[in-house]
Structures are given as C-alpha cells and as structure tokens.
C-alpha cells in the first residue's frame, strides 16, 4: 500500500479551498447570457468550445492531491445538479464557492463548524420553501420556449423548437436530439408507436420507392414465442384472408417454413402479410408486447394464459389504421385500443418508474409511457462545422432538460432574482446561537452571488445592479442580455424552479461537508528519480599496443 500524506485543520481546508476556487473560477465565466466561452483541449481532433458549466467542470483534474479533492467535491455539485435537474450547474458551482469562501472566514475566526452547518441547513430549508411559494406553473407554449431559450444561452430558435416538439408529442412525449444534415435545425415527429425492429424479409416490401411495407387497416397478431411451423398459423391466416385485410405478425421470431409461406402468399397476392420480431429482450419483450396489445386492442397469444396459435381467432388480433415497416423501425399509427385501457397501462408504468432504482430502467419505462401516450419527436441540430454541432447539441440537451424541469415544478423569475427574493424568508430567521446565525448569514450572502456573476460577465458593476434589484419587488430584475431593468417574467427571463432549488440544495450540501472537514488523507506523490547515465566506453585503454 502506498504511503499517505495526512494533513489536519486549516492547512487541509486551505488547500481544498484553492482547488474549489480554481474549478469554480473556470466554470463561472460561462454564467448568464453574456457568459464567456471556455476552450477544452482534446487528445484527438480539434479543441471543443463550450459555454456549458458541467462540461468545463468534468475536464478539470488538478496535479496537487489536496487541491484536487476540493475541485472534485465542487465537480460533484455540478454533476449532481445536472443529473437531477439537467441544468443549473454553473449556478450551483457559484453558490458552493461562495458558501465555502464565506464559511472558511468564520471557521478561521474560531466558530464551531457543526453549528455553521446547522445554520446553513436551516437557511436553505427556508429558502426552498420560499422558492416554492414564488413558483408559478408553466401553462403556455411561449413560457416553455422562453425557458428553453434561456437555458440554451439565450438562443430563441432552440427554445421554439423544443416548445413545438412538446406541443406535438405532449409534455410526457419522448424528445430526442440528433445530428442534423443541414445548417438549420429541424423537427421530425413520429406519430403513434415506434419500435426498433424492421421487416424479416425484403420480399414483404410493397412500396419500393420508400423501401417500406405499408399496411392499411391491418390485423396484428402478437405471439411471444418463435413461429417456424406454418400449420400452427393456418387457421388464423384463413380467417384473415376471408376478412380481406392485411396482417402483421409480431413474434419472438418467424423462420423457416412459416416465413417462406408468408413470403410466397405475399408475392402471389393471396394474402398481404408482413412479419417483424418483437421489440426488447426477456421480460421487457413481454411487457412491450403487452403495450402493443393494449394499443391495438388485441391479446398477446401466450401459453401462460392458455392461448395457442391454432385456436386464435380474429377477436384475439389487434387492429390499427396504418402500419409502416422499414428496414429498422416499425410504426403503428392509430391503434384500435381502448383509451381507458391505454390510460390504465400508462398509470401502471408510471408507478413502476417511481419504484425503479436504475437510471437505465427508468429511461426505458419513460420511453414506453411516451410511446403509449403521445409519440416521439426528434430535434435534428444543424450547424456549419462539427465543433459548432457538438456545442449546439449540448445546449439543446440542456434546454430540453430545463423545459422538462419547468413543466414538472413550475418557473421562477430568472437572472438570479428568484434567489434574491427568497432571501426575504431567511432574513428574519434566528438560529439557536451566534454560530448558527453566522451560518444563516453565509447563505444570505451566497444567494446574491449568481446575480453578481451574471452582471460581472456582462461587464457591468455588480454592487450597483444588486442594490437596485434588491430595492425592487417581485419579478423586477436586471436583464443582462439587453442591459435593461424590468419585469423579468414579461421579458421572458425565466428559470425552472427545480433547477434553482436543486442548485441551492446541492451547493449547500457539499460546501457544508467541506467546512466540517478537519483532516485530509492523500497519497504521497512519488518522486521520480533521474534515470541512470548510460555506460561509457571504458576498457579501451590498451589500444596503443595494437599500433
């Protein structure tokens, strides 16, 4: 085991604070509409230019072990805020730096760090309650567009695209971000349910121009096992042929004789059919088959429920208005399922989302809800160069998270004003002793910091602007983009409540940990000894005798 350096008290804290300041100073220049860019070196390819706080934070690794500990703790604030709320990483970093900086002064003056922490926690609790009171629900598409624009560093077109996508697929719908092919941003909406399985044979294609299988008003057969024997399928095929409608078979697999017979029937025009594999794997496959059954008003034919292929009737089959099958995707449009049944299924999946422990499971369940409830929207980001594309895509993703957060918990005035207004609830707070009161003061001072930084980045005098905004009431604040004072909500400068709340809570949590740290243990840096000199040309002394 490597030897360790153990550092106590002020010496440990001072080094960690240096690390906090290095990271926070690099991140906070990106805050606000006039935030500056940060250039990140890449080991391959060109450098990346970003205004995204968490991207900057993730790049920073310091040589000094103790400084690095401080930096990593603040990086945790940014990452945690990004994971929970999807935005607000720079605000959280600025708040954490301020709480650490002010707190260290009181610790150095001999105050009890544990009481300071209690005071900080008390103040943050009161501020969060006040933020909830200030918060208003997002109701209009315009508000959603404004939140998106602010989060995308004041890019109105991104906000509008996201609002448009939410209008099309609903607030629960899946919205994904992809690289576009042109210079302009595009929005593509897939109505109905889409899953990532294509046709099993190209011979099913009936629209050669688009290279897709298009089935109008088809029946849908759902089976949870492989189909290889055509005899099992014959009774159903005969009933469908009599009805004179197309058939889509969704099963674990369709192979051999069964697939060959379907293809031959299709080519001869006896029965218009297509077959695709069921989406997902294992238990998720069963759940998704059940989703499709509810959407199309059919039944999954499974031995567990006592149903077999030979005994299946038209009543067991689902129906849809139209189904399109490409090489890699199948889209079911306007399934014949019962609205109440679909709503019940959505509620059931939402309950599973609440209980899900892994992010992957939660994401997959949310996709299932969206597929049942609305549809899928794809925002294709356009840019002139790859560097610009990466930077813009990161901003669109941030904006998307922010708008989701706004829909979830509502909005507050942006530009650092919500935190200033929430100070009203703290100013009258009293702790149990003088040290706790000092903790409350630390938070009061920190809550001015985001506005100060926004103003500094805009090149104005912070103290003057903060004093003027404090004099105002409600939504009155400073719009750094235009340099004007006024009602920020009317100007469209909005922040999601969830983002502001999460930033404050995470910043206070990590900063309190740092204030109550009294010892740091780090690996002793290895001293690299200089390599030995190469051997000389010794032993050549007896050469005279050879002359």
From Swiss-Prot:
It is an enzyme of class 5 (isomerase). GO terms for molecular function: ATP binding; ATP-dependent protein folding chaperone; isomerase activity; unfolded protein binding. It is found in: Cytoplasm. GO terms for cellular component: cytoplasm. It catalyses: ATP + H2O + a folded polypeptide = ADP + phosphate + an unfolded polypeptide. ATP binds at residues 30-33, 51, 87-91, 415, 479-481, 495. GO terms for biological process: protein refolding. The keyword NADP does not apply. InterPro entries: Chaperonin_Cpn60_CS (IPR018370), Cpn60/GroEL (IPR001844), Cpn60/GroEL/TCP-1 (IPR002423), GroEL-like_apical_dom_sf (IPR027409), GROEL-like_equatorial_sf (IPR027413), TCP-1-like_intermed_sf (IPR027410). Keywords: ATP-binding, Chaperone, Cytoplasm, Isomerase, Nucleotide-binding. Pfam families: Cpn60_TCP1 (PF00118). Its EC number is 5.6.1.7. Together with its co-chaperonin GroES, plays an essential role in assisting protein folding. The GroEL-GroES system forms a nano-cage that allows encapsulation of the non-native substrate proteins and provides a physical environment optimized to promote and accelerate protein folding. HAMAP family: CH60. Belongs to the chaperonin (HSP60) family. Forms a cylinder of 14 subunits composed of two heptameric rings stacked back-to-back. Interacts with the co-chaperonin GroES. This is Chaperonin GroEL. It comes from Cupriavidus taiwanensis (strain DSM 17343 / BCRC 17206 / CCUG 44338 / CIP 107171 / LMG 19424 / R1). The lineage of its organism: Bacteria, Pseudomonadati, Pseudomonadota, Betaproteobacteria, Burkholderiales. The gene is groEL.
């Amino acid at each position: 085991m490597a030897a360790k350096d153990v550092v106590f008290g002020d010496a440990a804290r001072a080094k960690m604070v240096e690390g906090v300041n290095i990271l926070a100073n690099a991140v906070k220049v990106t805050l606000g509409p006039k935030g500056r860019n940060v250039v990140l070196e890449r080991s391959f390819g060109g450098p990346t230019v970003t205004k995204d706080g968490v991207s900057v934070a993730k790049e920073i690794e310091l040589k000094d072990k103790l400084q690095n500990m401080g930096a990593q703790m603040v990086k945790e604030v940014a990452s945690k805020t990004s994971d929970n709320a999807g935005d607000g990483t720079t605000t959280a970093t600025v708040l954490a730096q301020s709480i650490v900086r002010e707190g260290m002064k009181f610790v150095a003056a001999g105050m009890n760090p544990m009481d300071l922490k209690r005071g900080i926690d008390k103040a943050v609790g009161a501020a969060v309650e006040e933020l909830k009171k200030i918060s208003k629900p997002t109701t209009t598409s315009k508000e959603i567009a404004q939140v998106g624009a602010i989060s995308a560093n004041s890019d109105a077109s991104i906000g509008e695209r996201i609002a448009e996508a939410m209008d099309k697929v609903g607030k629960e719908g899946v919205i994904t971000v992809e690289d576009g092919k042109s210079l302009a941003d595009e929005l593509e909406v897939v109505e109905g349910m889409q899953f990532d399985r294509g046709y099993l044979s190209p011979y099913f294609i009936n629209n050669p121009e688009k290279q897709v299988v298009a089935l109008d008003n088809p029946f849908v057969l759902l089976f949870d096992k492989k189909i290889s024997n055509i005899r099992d399928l014959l009774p159903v095929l005969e009933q469908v042929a009599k009805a004179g409608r197309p058939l889509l078979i969704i099963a674990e697999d369709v192979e051999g004789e069964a697939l060959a017979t379907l293809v031959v029937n299709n080519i001869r025009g006896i029965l218009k059919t297509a077959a695709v594999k069921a989406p997902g794997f294992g238990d998720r496959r069963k759940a998704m088959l059940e989703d499709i059954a509810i959407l199309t008003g059919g039944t999954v034919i499974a031995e567990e429920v006592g149903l077999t292929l030979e005994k299946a009737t038209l009543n067991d089959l689902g129906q849809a208005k139209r189904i399109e099958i490409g090489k890699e995707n199948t889209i079911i449009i306007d399934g014949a399922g019962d609205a109440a049944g679909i709503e019940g299924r959505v509620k059931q999946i939402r309950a599973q989302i609440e209980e899900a422990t892994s992010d992957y499971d939660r994401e997959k369940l949310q996709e299932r809800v969206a597929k049942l409830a609305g549809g899928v929207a794809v925002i294709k980001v356009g840019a002139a160069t790859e560097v610009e594309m990466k930077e813009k895509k990161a901003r669109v993703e941030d904006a998307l998270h922010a708008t989701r957060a706004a829909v979830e918990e509502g909005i507050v005035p942006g530009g650092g004003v919500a935190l200033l207004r929430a100070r009203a609830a703290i100013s009258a707070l009293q702790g149990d002793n003088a040290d706790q009161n000092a903790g409350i003061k630390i938070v009061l001072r920190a809550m001015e910091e985001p506005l100060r930084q926004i103003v500094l980045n805009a090149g104005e005098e912070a103290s003057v602007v903060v004093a003027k905004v404090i004099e105002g009431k409600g939504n009155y604040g400073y719009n750094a983009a235009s340099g004007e004072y006024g009602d920020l909500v009317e100007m469209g400068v909005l922040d999601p409540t969830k983002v502001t709340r999460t930033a404050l809570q995470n910043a206070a949590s990590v900063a309190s940990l740092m204030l109550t740290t009294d010892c740091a243990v780090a690996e002793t840096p290895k001293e690299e000894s200089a390599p030995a000199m190469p051997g000389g040309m010794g032993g050549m002394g007896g050469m005279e005798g050879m002359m």
